[in-house]
A protein has these predicted regions:
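Short, surface-exposed coil-to-beta transition loops
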Residues: 82-87
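Conserved beta-strand segments of the P-loop GTPase G domain that flank and frequently precede/overlap
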Residues: 101-104
């Protein structure tokens, strides 16, 4: 039990969240329409500190390398009631950093922008 609490404490103090410029634009646009979105994103961050790649059916690892994992997750948004947003993020295990890549409402867009993910990986793996 002590080791779990210690690990959580270390992750809380070491973890860092950042966003791609495209993500910031999407967040700004969607936050105007869905007022609870920023608060919901903070809840996701608290969850990711405990379990960086998530658990259960709401988290799908789409790219898994030793240094970086790309994860697609369902974000419950209070403003949407029974529906949800999708968040694509990169988790850098060596640095304990999270980079938000994409945010979209499943009702507006069917799938993630794979070109953006590929570009992110190209720029950050080499």
């Amino acid at each position: 039990m002590f080791s779990i609490v210690r690990k959580k404490h270390l992750l809380e103090n070491m973890s860092h969240f950042s966003q791609l410029p495209e993500f910031e634009k999407e967040l700004s646009k969607l936050s105007k329409k869905y007022r609870s979105l920023e608060e919901d994103l903070k809840k996701l961050e608290r969850l990711l500190i405990i379990n960086p790649v998530g658990m259960g059916n709401n988290f799908i690892t789409t790219h898994d390398e030793p240094l970086v994992k790309i994860v697609k997750t369902r974000l419950a948004c209070k403003s949407l009631r029974n529906r949800s947003m999708r968040v694509i993020y990169a988790y850098h295990d060596d640095e304990v950093t999270f980079v938000y890549i994409e945010l979209y409402f499943k009702g507006d867009k069917e799938n993630e922008d794979r070109e953006r993910i590929a570009q992110y990986l190209k720029n950050n793996l080499f």
